[in-house]
Regions:
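Periplasmic-binding protein-like
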Residues: 119-128, 167, 201-207, 215, 249-277, 291-314, ...
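Von Willebrand factor
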Residues: 356-419, 427-470, 498-509, 530-531
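Acidic, polar low-complexity linker/tail segments
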Residues: 27-33, 309-362, 369-377
Length: 539
């Protein structure tokens, strides 16, 4: 919602976790992992395929310069760090280099020791960015702030914030582990036993109850904040700084950065080469590494709001970190110690099933005649990955006992509506979908309007709500897009509609829905199952 406002899973299962593909938000185009055209040149003799966190998209001007000067194509694939870690565990890694947000994802995923020449390109802490006037009223301006200080303001109803999913994005994961560490009293290391502490569980649930919008991407969280009306967000310092630059241009109130002193986590942006025996690619990678690590380019990277050493900021770049925004440039960063991989996965499993704010999701699914055959079978297969809990657990998308799920199946009318509370009855929804056969037209807006009515029956403040629409065609019911926009706004708005496009879906209309509701469009043509996983990762 917008405002100014289980037990331990097996390590083997969780190592298959799939996070969301990450890319910049295009209003009228489905999300993909495509790269900037300035980086790819078919005439260049060597192409490096790089799996990268979305936060590195801001550095594309530097990468484009390198590509042009060295005649090396850079094919950037923006993905979640957990997804990059998973790819490193494959027998054939589909990339020449990886650039996740944190070294821990290489350490966890690279069991075959394929990655070499790893270098930390920059570092950035994960911080709170809070509207300056609110931060001042909370007493945070100019103060040392602890995680418990923040928890107190959430419990008093004074603070809500946006944050990426801990199971889908490194910034969310890092912040979450920092919260756990601080709430446990800054132990030497987080253990499996400490995660079962009743006091910790109560506190972390209370803290995460303050999340009013979730995201699967750190870069898109910035976009969401700029387009919406929110009090605060947890994100990389570099993205808070670039958000403030945009807010400054728009004449809007900036965010004040708060660095929780007892739960600070750091992204170290490691770039590593995946050794698959190609000498030309290895040579090209080393040129890229040397370029990024050169003194000149490191200074340029600082101008993007990224620190290039734990010792602080170069004097000529101090203006990027404005004191009025709460930037701490003279303080030595003291990050928390991350838990070992098994405890990390257990913590993420608990986040998904017990700790995070429960999801409230309405799946609005197209069963019109054009979905006959392969399309409907793909849809059923995709929903199996979300609703059948053993499969969902492999992707860290399993349901919690307090979440609510609805399905609305439509063609030329709303054919079926069904609800399921918790993480057991949810599988009954899949069986209903499995029995459905496509026929008829596409009354898409009527179905979406019905979903809004269904969700209005819930106390939305207790959930992270979302509508996930899947369609393969043009709406041809009695309600048109403008009719739906009026209805959406009259009902208060605030519920994002994430669309999955398939076949002949009307991308312009889906893009307008995304813009209206501060959501995204995902491309289901390449892989419908993966598109549903991505969309679900946003709530």
């Amino acid at each position: 919602m917008m405002n100014r406002r289980a037990k331990k899973l097996s390590l083997l299962c969780l190592l298959l976790a799939v996070a969301l593909m990450i890319s910049a938000c295009g209003r009228q185009q489905p999300v993909s992992s495509g790269t900037n055209n300035e980086l790819v040149h078919s005439s260049y003799p060597v192409t490096l395929r790089i799996a990268s966190g979305s936060e590195n998209k801001e550095l594309e001007p530097l990468l484009a310069r390198f590509a042009k000067d060295n005649r090396i194509s850079l094919e950037m694939h923006y993905k979640g760090s957990v997804d990059i870690s998973r790819d490193l565990g494959l027998s054939k890694v589909p990339y020449d280099a990886v650039w996740p947000a944190s070294s821990m994802w290489i350490s966890i995923g690279d069991t075959g020791h394929k990655v070499k020449y790893t270098e930390s390109v920059s570092i950035t802490p994960v911080v709170f960015g809070i509207r300056e006037s609110l931060a001042r009223s909370l007493g945070f301006v100019g103060s040392r702030v602890s995680v418990r200080d923040i928890l107190g303001k959430i419990q008093s109803g004074e603070l809500t914030f946006c944050m990426t999913s801990a199971t889908q994005s490194n910034s969310g994961c890092s912040a979450y582990i920092g919260f756990l560490y601080a709430l446990l009293g800054s132990p030497d290391i987080i253990t499996s036993e400490s995660l079962q502490n009743p006091g910790l569980q109560k506190d972390i649930q209370a803290l995460l109850s303050g999340v009013d919008r979730s995201s699967g991407s750190s870069e898109w969280l910035k976009t969401l904040f700029l387009e919406g009306d929110f009090d605060a967000m947890v994100n990389y310092e570099s993205l808070i700084l670039s958000t403030n630059e945009e807010l400054d241009k728009q004449g809007r109130e900036p965010l004040y950065m708060v660095y929780p002193y007892d739960g600070l986590s750091i992204s170290d942006a490691p770039l590593g080469y995946v050794d698959q025996g190609d000498g030309k690619k290895e040579e090209a990678f080393l040129k890229l590494r040397d370029f990024l690590m050169s003194r000149e380019v490191q200074a340029e990277i600082q101008r993007y709001g990224r620190r290039t050493g734990f010792e602080g900021i170069l004097p000529e770049n101090k203006e990027v970190w404005r004191e009025a925004w709460g930037a701490q440039t003279d303080t030595i960063l003291s990050p928390i110690r991350m838990p070992d991989s098994e405890v990390l996965w257990e913590a993420l499993g608990l986040y998904q099933t017990q700790f995070k704010k429960p999801s409230l999701t309405a799946y609005v699914l197209d069963f019109s005649g054009s979905m006959r055959g392969g399309p409907s079978e793909q849809l059923k297969g995709a929903m199996a990955e979300i609703l059948l809990q053993e499969r969902a657990a492999k992707n860290l998308l399993q349901a919690s006992q307090h979440e609510e799920n609805l399905i609305l199946l439509f063609s030329d009318e709303l054919r079926k509506t069904e609800k399921a509370a918790g993480n057991v009855a949810i599988e009954d929804l899949y069986r209903t979908i499995e029995r459905e056969s496509p026929a008829g037209g596409t009354a898409m807006y009527e179905a979406l309007d019905a979903a809004l009515d269904q969700l209005a029956a819930y106390d939305l403040g207790q959930y992270t709500p979302a509508i996930i629409l899947m369609t393969d065609g043009m709406a041809n019911g009695n309600m048109n897009l403008n009719d739906f926009k009026r209805s959406y706004e009259s009902k208060g708005g605030g519920i994002p509609i994430f669309s999955i496009s398939f076949g002949n879906a009307d991308l312009d209309a889906l893009g307008e829905l995304a813009a209206l509701t501060h959501a995204r469009v995902f491309d289901g043509d390449r892989d419908l199952v993966d598109a549903f996983r991505k969309a679900k990762g946003y709530n």
